[in-house]
From Swiss-Prot:
Associated pathway: Isoprenoid biosynthesis; isopentenyl diphosphate biosynthesis via DXP pathway; isopentenyl diphosphate from 1-deoxy-D-xylulose 5-phosphate: step 1/6
Enzyme class: oxidoreductase
The protein's name in its UniProt record: 1-deoxy-D-xylulose 5-phosphate reductoisomerase
Cofactor(s) it depends on: Mg(2+); Mn(2+)
Catalytic reaction equation(s): 2-C-methyl-D-erythritol 4-phosphate + NADP(+) = 1-deoxy-D-xylulose 5-phosphate + NADPH + H(+)
Residues engaged in binding Mn(2+): 151, 153, 222
Binding site for NADPH: 21-24, 47, 50, 127, 129, 206
EC number: 1.1.1.267
Keywords: Isoprene biosynthesis, Manganese, Metal-binding, NADP, Oxidoreductase
One term of GO molecular function: manganese ion binding
Family the UniProt entry places it in: Belongs to the DXR family.
Length: 402
């Protein structure tokens, strides 16, 4: 395998796209197609839920190295090179790439993340769950600078941190739009439907990310990811609400300076930067327009109504496999909400219940199996909590969000 460390000096970068049919994956392929002098697709991987899109991508890119995680979907797709249970991981291990973009959804991305790091390729990481769940294992496997974040907030922090040295950093500030329920009361949230939770005010994302943003669980995952990526203690990471989603994050330095990264909400900017890091791709996104009056608002997060971020902070500070427990409990609870089995507030309530009983997992994992065991336990515990939850406030499943 080849590690890409010198930008574009040696020719086009070979990119392996995992999660190619999702929101991040499709936008990444658009970035690559718009910059054929910089990037070349060498492989695609998908879960298997959108075979028509994958077929179109195969035709457009001419790629033959393709993996589908779901065996049944792989059989329906026909001539697919990798379709075993470990298809995506094998694709990463056997395909020469300079950059592996991991945009898979959920904990499915952990083994491919570790395989990408072992290959020496740069890992453009959009699958935050693999870092949150794998934590110490992922950090141990990574070379310095090998992981480049795709999330807009972490991309912003990486850019802002260029303005100073590590010992000059006072704190990191993550921004959150506040989601579609910003300003709502806890009582109001009892009546939220999956359709309402699937409408983000500023970003266009996949269904699970959109729901996680509505519950603020996504910001909790990003808090954990921030600590792991940049090595900053949790007490030096703040979360503020910024409904316009123009300032994507900020870094405050010891002299009182605060450096912010601002751009209109468009994931193609952090995607392009992660693919070409540390060089920028011209024309990746629109500029901010300062020719007209506008207001950028910042306000504190209401932790009482939206406790997901503080639960994530607790899980991260406790350490061990607790962040994996947080993530797995959320995945179960989110699925239950979309199926109409629990109310919207019960998503975070389920996470809290599982974390409260998870003291046994406050031990660092020795291997991937330890992480998977913690997640399996968390899912089972979450399922029990969901079964006990009151159906009051639960709503019908909305097609297209589950």
């Amino acid at each position: 395998m080849t590690t890409a460390t010198d930008g574009f000096a040696d020719g086009r970068l070979r990119v392996l796209v995992l999660g190619s049919t999702g929101s991040i994956g499709t936008q990444a392929l658009e970035v690559i197609a718009a910059n054929p002098d910089r990037f070349e697709v060498v492989g695609l991987a998908a879960g298997g839920s959108n075979l028509d899109t994958l077929r179109r991508q195969r035709a457009e890119t001419g790629v033959t190295e393709i993996a589908i995680a779901d065996e049944r979907a792989a059989q329906l797709a026909g001539d697919i090179a990798y379709q075993e249970p470990d298809a995506v991981t094998r694709l990463v291990e056997e395909t020469e790439a300079d950059v592996v973009l991991n945009a898979l959804v959920g904990a499915l991305g952990l083994r491919p993340t570790l395989a990408a790091l072992a290959s020496g390729a740069r890992l453009a990481l959009a699958n935050k769950e693999s870092l949150v769940a794998g934590g110490p294992l992922v950090l141990q496997a990574a070379q310095p600078g090998q992981i480049v974040p795709v999330d807009s907030e972490h991309s912003a922090l990486a850019q802002c941190l260029r303005a100073g040295t590590p010992d000059e950093v006072a704190k990191l500030v993550l921004t959150a739009s506040g989601g579609p329920f910003r300003g709502w009361s806890a009582a109001d949230l009892q009546e939220v439907t999956p359709e309402q939770a699937g409408a983000h005010p500023t970003w266009s994302m996949g269904p699970m990310n959109t729901l996680n943003s509505a519950s603020l669980v996504n910001k909790g995952l990003e808090l954990i990811e921030t600590h792991l990526l940049f090595g900053i203690s949790y007490e030096r990471i703040e979360v503020v609400v910024h409904p316009q989603s123009i300032v994507h994050s900020m870094v405050t330095f010891v002299d009182g300076s605060t450096i912010a990264q601002a751009s209109p909400p468009d994931m193609k900017l952090p995607i392009s930067l992660a693919l070409g890091w540390p060089r920028r791709v011209p024309g990746a996104a629109r500029y901010c327009d300062f020719s007209q009056a506008q207001t950028w608002e910042f306000e504190p997060l209401d932790d009482e109504v939206f406790p997901a971020v503080e639960l994530a902070r607790h899980a991260g500070e406790t350490g061990g496999c607790m962040t994996a427990v947080y993530n797995a409990a959320n995945e179960e609870a989110a699925a239950a909400f979309l199926a109409g089995r629990i109310s919207f507030p019960a998503i975070v309530g389920t996470i809290a219940d599982v974390l409260h009983a998870a003291d046994q997992w406050a031990v660092s994992p020795a291997n991937v199996d330890d992480v998977l065991d913690a997640q399996r336990w968390a899912r089972q515990r979450a399922q029990r909590a969901i079964a006990k939850a009151s159906p009051a406030g639960a709503c019908e499943k909305v097609s297209g969000l589950a």
